[in-house]
């Protein structure tokens, strides 16, 4: 799923830009 983060998600930060984009991260 995706959760709001308040900052841009990057793969290096363990996030999924492909699925979530701005202000969202995989959990």
From Swiss-Prot:
Entry keywords, A to Z: Disulfide bond, Hydroxylation, Ion channel impairing toxin, Knottin, Neurotoxin, Secreted, Toxin, Voltage-gated sodium channel impairing toxin
Primary location group: secreted
Subcellular location: Secreted
Sample GO molecular function, one term: toxin activity
Tissues in which the protein is found: Confined to the epidermis and to the mucus layer.
Disulfide cysteine pairs (residue numbers): 2-16, 9-20, 15-26
Marked site: Hydrophobic/aromatic residue important for potent activity: 8
Gene Ontology CC annotations of this record: extracellular region
Domain comment, as recorded: The presence of a 'disulfide through disulfide knot' structurally defines this protein as a knottin.
Functional summary from the UniProt entry: Highly potent toxin against both insect and some mammalian sodium channels (Nav). It potently inhibits inactivation of insect sodium channels of B.germanica (BgNav1) and also delays the inactivation of mammalian Nav with potent activity on Nav1.3/SCN3A and Nav1.4/SCN4A. 1 uM is enough to completely inhibits the inactivation, resulting in sustained non-inactivating currents. In addition, the toxin significantly enhances the recovery from inactivation, and the open state is not required for the toxin to interact with the channel.
Family stated for the protein in its record: Belongs to the nemertide family.
Additional remarks: Negative results: does not show effect on rat Nav1.8/SCN10A.
Protein name per its UniProtKB record: Nemertide alpha-8
Species, as recorded: Riseriellus occultus
């Amino acid at each position: 799923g995706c959760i709001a983060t308040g900052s841009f998600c990057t793969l290096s930060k363990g996030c999924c830009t492909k699925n979530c984009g701005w202000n969202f991260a995989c959990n």
